[in-house]
Every structure is written in structure tokens, then in C-alpha cells.
């Protein structure tokens, strides 16, 4: 493919730009470059529409672009800088730094489009990733090198949970992390950057970020759909370099996968494709598969990914979240009804799943305690209609005991977060998985039936609940 072939813009429709070439046509997914004033604008070829014209998607605003402007074909896909030099920096979808700390000092780049690792290159592990969050570690544990989805509607705590996971896992994790901000709030991206600096995960020296452990790639809500659709791939390309070339175990955080799908739907409509169910692009499953299949662990290294996934109108059967489900090893589902009770994290203990909850992986004791906790909560759920109509007095003694324990378990699944300390005033708690299993085993066995419900709310281990009960009695 010849580089530096030039064409001219014939039509601009918002983020969609048509470019006509006299000579060779660029390939689909090639990056084209043009100048708008003093800035570089990258276009990605999406379609060939005849008459030597290609239809492209802009990766930035097309304000100031005019018909007749010259466009150069780079001869390759969008390429972003990769390697240790990206750590401690904030980049955009095309790999340009946006943190006002000068250019990235590397000539190493990698194209954002590539094949997923082949079947024989892939590797799986059966090692648990401890998060320090009780409800996750007990009922839907995460696997090292696995894919984790945090599902939830608007305002139930996905971003807070992903930030707590960054706090608990990334800070104690020896390797590197990559965070892709896909179509979310710029303010949250800014807060995360400063939190990472405060925590020492990003080290800012005089003109250097040496010693940093995380690279940030942002394509936020105000960006055009092309940028939001591709920024996840840009972040993933950086994570793949650390996995493949340096053999590292990488943590890859994405907030939010739904915005990737949403941007794909916008682009699809702009390109004139006939939409499928609920207005999504007809290629929804293909687009999701192209991204998700690359997020995997190989014999060289691993990528453990944590993805926040917005659920439109709290409907888990919506095509966007439903398409994500099949790619994940563990799902943590956040429930508005639990958030309304003031129980945070608002994780639904009966709706969250993990393929790691297996006695061969977590051990017999952990598995049995988790299943007993779910059995008690399920019994309570099925009794709620009877309680609502007839009241607690009509229940048998056994059922009353089940309800009392379930309410204590529900409250004990709450936990103060480190990242929410400034709002709650309660110091965050990291609970080791052994303490979590031991505490819930004792509650299920009835050893703490005498403690009041309030003692179990927003504490760490069972010992903290006992102390809280004593202080409640003292003030009563």
C-alpha cells in the first residue's frame, strides 16, 4: 500500500467525512491525516462508497474543516505509542498526550487494530484475585487473568466500585495498569488522575514520570463518537504491549463499555446502516467480540480486566449489556433496590455470578459458606411477599430465624470504601478473604443471632460488628 497518497474532502456531515482520491484508494481502517489550523485531525476509513471516494469517521471535532482540504493516507491503521514511556501519562484516542507534560519520549508505536491471540497462545489460570470487598470475594470471586463486568444503572455506584478496585488491587499490584475512560465524565477522569498521584501510583518528576505504574487513555463524553468508539482499543493496545513484549500481568480497567457500544450505534447510524433491535448497530456482537477477544491471557503474560457496564433503564436484557455477559468470567450486578436501602456497595448477592465459585478453585469451606449465604438470602426473598401481606407474626419460628439472619447478612455485605472516605467520614476497610469466610460462616451457624441488626452495618470483620454492638449498647 503506497503511503502519502493524497485526496481531497468532498463532503462533511458532522463527524463523517467523505474523501476523494485520484490514485490508489486507502484500505478500510486506514488512518488519514489532515490539518485544521495548527492541530492534526485523524480520520479512519469506514466505507468505500464508489467514484474513488471513501467515507471516514473523524477522531476529533471537524470544526474548521472545509471541502477541498487536502488529506494524506498514512498507509496504516491508527497507531498509538506503547511501552514504559506511556506510564504516568494521559493520552487520547490517537496517542497524543493531553496532560500538558510534553510529547511521549518513544518511537515505539502499535496499530490499534490487530488479531486476537490464537487458540494455542491462550492460557487460563485458576488463581483468585483478592479484592478485599466482602460481597465480591465471598459470592462472585474474581480470577487472575479473567474478565470482570460491573453491571448497574445510573447512579448505583459502578465508578466508585471500579475506583475502589483500582485502590485495592492496582496499588498493591506489582505490575502495570492501564485505565481506559470511554465516554464517561471528564471530572471523574481528572479526579482519578489526582488520586493516583496522591497514592504514588503516578510519580511526577521534573520532566519525567519514571516509576509510575499506570497509563491513562481518555475519550470522554464530550468527544465525537469516533473517538469514543476507538479509545477502548487504544488502551487495550497499550496493555497488550506490556503483556506480549514484557511478559507482565497487566490490570486493564474500562469505564464504560456501554459507551463503546453507544458510540458504535451513533457511527453506524451516521454511515447509514439499518439499525437492529432498540436502535443498536447490526454489528453489535461483532464489535463487542473484536474488543473482548483481545482482552485475554496468553502464555507470555496476562490481562485481568475490570469493566464497568451501564445498564440502560436497569434492564439487563437490553442488547448492549446482554451482549457483554457471554464474554465475562465474573459479573458483579449492582441493584438499585439495595442502594435505596443504603447498603453500599449495592451488589446483588443473588444476581452476581462467577465461574470461580467452584470448590476446586476456592476450596470446599468457602464454596459451602457462599452457597449457604445465598440459600438464606433466597429464602428471605421468597418470604417477602408473605411478610408484606400477613406480617412477620404469621411466619414459623424457623422462617423468623431465617429472616433475622438474612437481614444481618444483607447489612454485613456492606462495607466502607477507601475512595468514599471523604463523603462518609468512615475509614475504608480491606477485608482478607479468610476473615470474610470465617465471619459469614459464624453468622450462618447462628453464633451472632443475639447481636442487633445495626451492629452488622458498614463494618469489616465480625469482630468489628461485636465492637459496634457493644458501643450501641453503651449509648442505648
Swiss-Prot record:
CDD domains: ATP-synt_F1_beta_C, ATP-synt_F1_beta_N, F1-ATPase_beta_CD
Signal peptide: none
Domain of life: Bacteria
A GO MF label: proton-transporting ATP synthase activity, rotational mechanism
Quaternary structure note: F-type ATPases have 2 components, CF(1) - the catalytic core - and CF(0) - the membrane proton channel. CF(1) has five subunits: alpha(3), beta(3), gamma(1), delta(1), epsilon(1). CF(0) has three main subunits: a(1), b(2) and c(9-12). The alpha and beta chains form an alternating ring which encloses part of the gamma chain. CF(1) is attached to CF(0) by a central stalk formed by the gamma and epsilon chains, while a peripheral stalk is formed by the delta and b chains.
GO cellular component, as recorded: plasma membrane; proton-transporting ATP synthase complex
InterPro entries: AAA+_ATPase, ATP-synt_VA_C, ATP_synth_F1_bsu, ATPase_a/bsu_AS, ATPase_alpha/beta_chains, ATPase_F1/V1/A1_a/bsu_N, ATPase_F1/V1/A1_a/bsu_N_sf, ATPase_F1/V1/A1_a/bsu_nucl-bd
Family: Belongs to the ATPase alpha/beta chains family.
UniProt keyword terms in alphabetical order: ATP synthesis, ATP-binding, Cell inner membrane, Cell membrane, CF(1), Hydrogen ion transport, Ion transport, Membrane, Nucleotide-binding, Translocase, Transport
Reaction catalyzed: ATP + H2O + 4 H(+)(in) = ADP + phosphate + 5 H(+)(out)
Localization of this protein: Cell inner membrane
Name this protein carries in UniProt: ATP synthase subunit beta
UniProt keyword Translocase present: yes
The keyword Transmembrane appears for this protein: no
SUPFAM superfamilies reported in the protein's UniProt record: C-terminal domain of alpha and beta subunits of F1 ATP synthase, N-terminal domain of alpha and beta subunits of F1 ATP synthase, P-loop containing nucleoside triphosphate hydrolases
Membrane topology per record: Peripheral membrane protein
Chain sites annotated for binding ATP: 152-159
Pfam families: ATP-synt_ab (PF00006), ATP-synt_ab_N (PF02874), ATP-synt_VA_C (PF22919)
HAMAP family in the record: ATP_synth_beta_bact
SMART domains for the chain: AAA
Assigned EC number: 7.1.2.2
Function statement: Produces ATP from ADP in the presence of a proton gradient across the membrane. The catalytic sites are hosted primarily by the beta subunits.
